[in-house]
C-alpha cells in the first residue's frame, strides 16, 4: 500500500572515493555496464513513494553526473561539502523549501539498493522517526588496543552492520544537522550517529546483504563477478542492412564520416553498419527491428544520426538488467576500403555503446564484383550481437 507520507531521497555523491582506485570518483565507475551512481539512483527515481530525489555532488563532477543520470528525473544537484556530514546537510537544506515528511539518506557508493529496502525504510521512519537498515554480524569481532593486541570480544548478538538508506522525519534530522554545525561537530560517520548524539532513538529494520558499499578495488572485482554470474541467459541476434548510393560527398559508416564521391539514399544518415548492429541487438532481445522502433514514415528521423538508434538499442538491454557482451559487423562493398578505418570504427562503436573495444569487431569483404555491391551501387552490412540477461528458473528474463 502506498505511503501517505511525502518522502524525498538524498543521494550523497560528493566524495572522491580514492580507495577504490581507477583514478576518479568511484560513483562514476561502471559496474555491470552501468555507472555506480546510475544504479544507486534508479530504485529511488522509480519508487512510487519517493516524490523527489536530491543529488549532492562535487561541482567538478557535474558533467559526469549529467551523463550518468540522463534518464532520471531529479532536483537540481546541491554542491557537497568537505565532509560527508556537510554534504548531507547541503542536501537537507536544498529540500527545506519544499520539506518532505520523511527523508532517506543514501550513499551513492551502494548501487544495489532495492525497491523493497526503500519501502522498509519509509515504513520504519514513519513508525520510529529515525531508523537504519542493519544486518547481523556473523563473524566474531575483536576489539584491540593501540598495539593491535585483543583486549575485548564484543557479543556479536548485540552488534549490527549499518547500511543506507537511513530514514528520518525530515525536521528532526535537519535540526540535528544544524545543531551539529553550530557546535562545530563534523566527525559523525553516518546520520544515525548524529541522531543519537542529539538524543534521538534510532530504530533498526531489516537490511540487505547485497546492499554493500563499494570501497576498494577488490569490491569492484567481486561485484563484477557476481553480476556476470547472474546474467546466465545468453542470447544472440543477427542484423542486415543495405543502402544504395546517391548524391553526396561522404558516407556514414559505423559512426565514422568517410569522404566519398557519393552519399547514401536513406531516410536517416544511412549508416548501414550501425543499422545492422541495431537490428542484431533488437533481435537478441526479441524486441522487433529498427523499422518498428524508428519507422521511416516518421519525419522526426529524417536525416537522424544513427548513433541515436544504436544507443537506444543498448539502453533496451540495460533496462532489462542485461549487458551487451559482443558486437560484430561485416561491411560488404568494393569501395571505400574499410581496413584503414577499422580501428576508428571500433572505437566509435565502443564510445556509443559503452562496450569495451576488445569486444567489438569490424570486418569487411567484397562480393567479387557480383551483384549490386560488386557494381558499386551501394553497401550492405551484416551484424551479430551477443547479450546477457538475468535468468530465472522459468527461462524468462526478470
Swiss-Prot record:
<dbReference type="Pfam" id="PF02542">
    <property type="entry name" value="YgbB"/>
</dbReference>
<feature type="site" description="Positions MEP for the nucleophilic attack">
    <location>
        <position position="156"/>
    </location>
</feature>
<feature type="binding site">
    <location>
        <begin position="289"/>
        <end position="291"/>
    </location>
    <ligand>
        <name>4-CDP-2-C-methyl-D-erythritol 2-phosphate</name>
    </ligand>
</feature>
<keyword id="KW-0414">Isoprene biosynthesis</keyword>
<dbReference type="GO" id="GO:0008685">
    <property type="term" value="F:2-C-methyl-D-erythritol 2,4-cyclodiphosphate synthase activity"/>
</dbReference>
<feature type="binding site">
    <location>
        <position position="375"/>
    </location>
    <ligand>
        <name>4-CDP-2-C-methyl-D-erythritol 2-phosphate</name>
    </ligand>
</feature>
<dbReference type="GO" id="GO:0046872">
    <property type="term" value="F:metal ion binding"/>
</dbReference>
<keyword id="KW-0479">Metal-binding</keyword>
<feature type="site" description="Transition state stabilizer">
    <location>
        <position position="19"/>
    </location>
</feature>
<feature type="site" description="Transition state stabilizer">
    <location>
        <position position="267"/>
    </location>
</feature>
<feature type="region of interest" description="2-C-methyl-D-erythritol 2,4-cyclodiphosphate synthase">
    <location>
        <begin position="235"/>
        <end position="398"/>
    </location>
</feature>
<dbReference type="InterPro" id="IPR026596">
    <property type="entry name" value="IspD/F"/>
</dbReference>
<feature type="binding site">
    <location>
        <position position="275"/>
    </location>
    <ligand>
        <name>a divalent metal cation</name>
    </ligand>
</feature>
<dbReference type="InterPro" id="IPR020555">
    <property type="entry name" value="MECDP_synthase_CS"/>
</dbReference>
<comment type="pathway">
    <text>Isoprenoid biosynthesis; isopentenyl diphosphate biosynthesis via DXP pathway; isopentenyl diphosphate from 1-deoxy-D-xylulose 5-phosphate: step 4/6.</text>
</comment>
<dbReference type="Pfam" id="PF01128">
    <property type="entry name" value="IspD"/>
</dbReference>
<feature type="site" description="Transition state stabilizer">
    <location>
        <position position="26"/>
    </location>
</feature>
<dbReference type="InterPro" id="IPR034683">
    <property type="entry name" value="IspD/TarI"/>
</dbReference>
<comment type="function">
    <text>Bifunctional enzyme that catalyzes the formation of 4-diphosphocytidyl-2-C-methyl-D-erythritol from CTP and 2-C-methyl-D-erythritol 4-phosphate (MEP) (IspD), and catalyzes the conversion of 4-diphosphocytidyl-2-C-methyl-D-erythritol 2-phosphate (CDP-ME2P) to 2-C-methyl-D-erythritol 2,4-cyclodiphosphate (ME-CPP) with a corresponding release of cytidine 5-monophosphate (CMP) (IspF).</text>
</comment>
<feature type="binding site">
    <location>
        <begin position="365"/>
        <end position="368"/>
    </location>
    <ligand>
        <name>4-CDP-2-C-methyl-D-erythritol 2-phosphate</name>
    </ligand>
</feature>
<keyword id="KW-0511">Multifunctional enzyme</keyword>
<dbReference type="GO" id="GO:0019288">
    <property type="term" value="P:isopentenyl diphosphate biosynthetic process, methylerythritol 4-phosphate pathway"/>
</dbReference>
<dbReference type="InterPro" id="IPR036571">
    <property type="entry name" value="MECDP_synthase_sf"/>
</dbReference>
<protein>
    <recommendedName>
        <fullName>Bifunctional enzyme IspD/IspF</fullName>
        <ecNumber>2.7.7.60</ecNumber>
        <ecNumber>4.6.1.12</ecNumber>
    </recommendedName>
</protein>
<comment type="similarity">
    <text>In the N-terminal section; belongs to the IspD/TarI cytidylyltransferase family. IspD subfamily.</text>
</comment>
<dbReference type="InterPro" id="IPR029044">
    <property type="entry name" value="Nucleotide-diphossugar_trans"/>
</dbReference>
<dbReference type="GO" id="GO:0016114">
    <property type="term" value="P:terpenoid biosynthetic process"/>
</dbReference>
<comment type="similarity">
    <text>In the C-terminal section; belongs to the IspF family.</text>
</comment>
<dbReference type="InterPro" id="IPR003526">
    <property type="entry name" value="MECDP_synthase"/>
</dbReference>
<keyword id="KW-0456">Lyase</keyword>
<dbReference type="InterPro" id="IPR001228">
    <property type="entry name" value="IspD"/>
</dbReference>
<comment type="pathway">
    <text>Isoprenoid biosynthesis; isopentenyl diphosphate biosynthesis via DXP pathway; isopentenyl diphosphate from 1-deoxy-D-xylulose 5-phosphate: step 2/6.</text>
</comment>
<feature type="binding site">
    <location>
        <begin position="267"/>
        <end position="268"/>
    </location>
    <ligand>
        <name>4-CDP-2-C-methyl-D-erythritol 2-phosphate</name>
    </ligand>
</feature>
<feature type="binding site">
    <location>
        <position position="243"/>
    </location>
    <ligand>
        <name>a divalent metal cation</name>
    </ligand>
</feature>
<keyword id="KW-0808">Transferase</keyword>
<feature type="region of interest" description="2-C-methyl-D-erythritol 4-phosphate cytidylyltransferase">
    <location>
        <begin position="1"/>
        <end position="234"/>
    </location>
</feature>
<dbReference type="GO" id="GO:0050518">
    <property type="term" value="F:2-C-methyl-D-erythritol 4-phosphate cytidylyltransferase activity"/>
</dbReference>
<feature type="binding site">
    <location>
        <begin position="241"/>
        <end position="243"/>
    </location>
    <ligand>
        <name>4-CDP-2-C-methyl-D-erythritol 2-phosphate</name>
    </ligand>
</feature>
<feature type="binding site">
    <location>
        <position position="241"/>
    </location>
    <ligand>
        <name>a divalent metal cation</name>
    </ligand>
</feature>
<feature type="site" description="Positions MEP for the nucleophilic attack">
    <location>
        <position position="213"/>
    </location>
</feature>
<dbReference type="InterPro" id="IPR018294">
    <property type="entry name" value="ISPD_synthase_CS"/>
</dbReference>
<keyword id="KW-0548">Nucleotidyltransferase</keyword>
